[in-house]
């Protein structure tokens, strides 16, 4: 992602939805001593987590920390940034068009945006699959879990994680005034598992706003149903007999219009 951003020494990088700083810290050596990286997130706890080990960067003027949402970057002045990066952030934003307008506003003319987003609705809903594992014998229980979590297809228009695809993001980018847009859609289907055992699966949440898989199972199923469900999954998960599928969009966007 950072390679595609083409960050140069002396530039100002704004990482929107910085989280634990994966992208922002990676940009620090690229901007050099004369550049600056701004960590931006809605979570003050995450900003504090990023700030603590690198106070010297803030004192030296090489790092900034701003609490703001992608769709409202009002603390960031107009035309003050050379590069905007955002990774797996827009899936949590309902007003995606507003986020793109804010990206355009804070960018200097002829600068760029780099976006990496999973396209969660690329694959159709499949009740025969549960997080990459064959669930055909317990299909009815899978359906009960997803309905309980509001993940049936009827709710997709209201779910910011599911109500868009790569074409929608392209449309938002153009409407915001980003003149040159390059889109790369990457789709992967691979054998294997993304978790080592059932305990890790049930302890995992699909996103920071969601319940863990175990909590979702407990909320949707009776204890007897949950026992049946986990008894089916355990040998598959523990042996890694699954299939991983993913679709994501990575696109450098720019330059902005003057």
Specify the residue positions occupied by each region the protein language model found.
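C-terminal helical/coil "lid" or tail adjacent to the Rossmann-like core of SAM-dependent
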Residues: 180-242
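A short acidic, Gly/Pro-enriched loop at the edge of an enzyme's catalytic core
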Residues: 71-83
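Conserved alpha-helix/loop element of class I SAM-dependent methyltransferases that forms part
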Residues: 1-11, 26
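A short glycine-rich, Lys/Arg-flanked "PGG" loop and its adjoining helix->strand segment in the class I
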Residues: 97-112
């Amino acid at each position: 992602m950072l390679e595609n951003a083409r960050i140069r020494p002396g530039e100002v990088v704004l990482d929107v939805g910085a989280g634990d700083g994966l992208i922002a810290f990676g940009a620090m050596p690229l901007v050099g001593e004369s550049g600056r990286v701004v960590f931006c997130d809605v979570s003050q706890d995450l900003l504090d987590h990023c700030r603590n080990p690198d106070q010297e960067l803030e004192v030296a003027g090489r790092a900034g920390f701003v609490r703001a949402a992608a769709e409202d970057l009002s603390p960031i002045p107009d035309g003050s940034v050379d590069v905007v990066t955002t990774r797996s952030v827009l899936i949590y934003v309902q007003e995606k068009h507003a986020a793109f307008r804010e990206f355009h506003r804070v960018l200097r003319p002829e600068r760029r945006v780099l976006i990496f987003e999973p396209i969660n609705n690329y694959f159709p809903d499949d009740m025969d699959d549960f997080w990459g594992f064959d669930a055909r014998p317990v299909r009815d229980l899978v359906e009960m879990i997803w309905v309980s979590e509001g993940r049936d297809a009827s709710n997709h228009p209201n779910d910011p994680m599911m109500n868009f695809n790569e074409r929608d993001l392209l449309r938002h980018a153009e409407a915001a005034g980003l003149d040159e847009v390059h889109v790369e859609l990457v789709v992967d289907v691979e054998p294997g598992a993304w978790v080592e055992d059932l305990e890790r699966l049930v302890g995992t949440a699909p996103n920071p706003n969601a319940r863990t898989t175990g909590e979702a199972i407990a909320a949707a199923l009776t204890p007897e149903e949950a026992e049946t469900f986990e008894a089916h999954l355990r040998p598959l998960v523990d042996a890694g007999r699954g299939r991983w599928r993913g679709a994501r969009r990575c696109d450098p966007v720019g330059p902005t219009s003057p």
